[in-house]
């Protein structure tokens, strides 16, 4: 990655971020850009419950902090909605602080997540979901080689577009 570093989340640091950006900074030594904490606070109750029970980093479950190399600040969060399923399907998700949007960072992150999934040797398909309209998120996925495969209703009964990419196969095991 050219501009960013992905740092696997340590559960206690994510719990600190839920508490406050200052608590996260004290726990991790990294500042947090405006807007990042709000993405985590809005996470599902299941994710928050799993986080409270966890003791070790798990990129498939808890993802990564997106650290801007020059500014040395967490500009977003990214990861997967869980480990690959029995069909080798994994879903990616990412968010970037409004102060850092529009600079290509989401594209850099999406590519890194696809590379991570591919290098696991366990993933056949990477998917993502967007609002059902052309926007910055759809352009990110198109740049990364995803193709729109359909429309579905999400768990909150909102129409979304489903995007998929078949990453190159790898023989390593993450």
Per-region residue spans from a language model:
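Conserved active-site alpha-helix within GNAT-family acetyltransferase domains
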Residues: 107, 133-150
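Glycine-centered recognition micro-motifs in short, flexible terminal segments and loops
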Residues: 98-108
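GNAT-family acyltransferases
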Residues: 1-91, 96-99, 112-116, 120, ...
């Amino acid at each position: 990655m050219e501009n960013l570093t992905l740092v696997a989340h340590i559960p206690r640091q994510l719990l600190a971020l839920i508490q406050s950006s200052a608590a996260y900074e004290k726990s991790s030594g990294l500042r947090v850009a405006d807007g990042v904490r709000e993405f985590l606070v809005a996470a599902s109750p299941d994710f928050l419950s799993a986080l409270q029970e966890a003791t070790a980093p798990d990129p498939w479950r808890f993802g990564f902090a997106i650290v801007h190399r020059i500014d040395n600040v967490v500009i977003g969060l990214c990861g997967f909605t869980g480990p690959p399923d029995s069909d080798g399907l994994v879903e990616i998700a990412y968010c970037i602080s409004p102060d850092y949007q529009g600079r290509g960072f989401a594209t850099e992150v999406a590519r890194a997540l696809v590379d991570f999934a591919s290098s696991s040797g366990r993933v056949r398909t990477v998917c993502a979901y967007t609002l059902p309209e052309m926007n910055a998120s759809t352009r990110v996925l198109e740049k990364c080689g995803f193709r729109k495969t359909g429309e579905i209703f999400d768990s909150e009964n909102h129409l979304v577009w489903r995007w998929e990419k078949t990453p190159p196969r790898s023989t390593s095991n993450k």
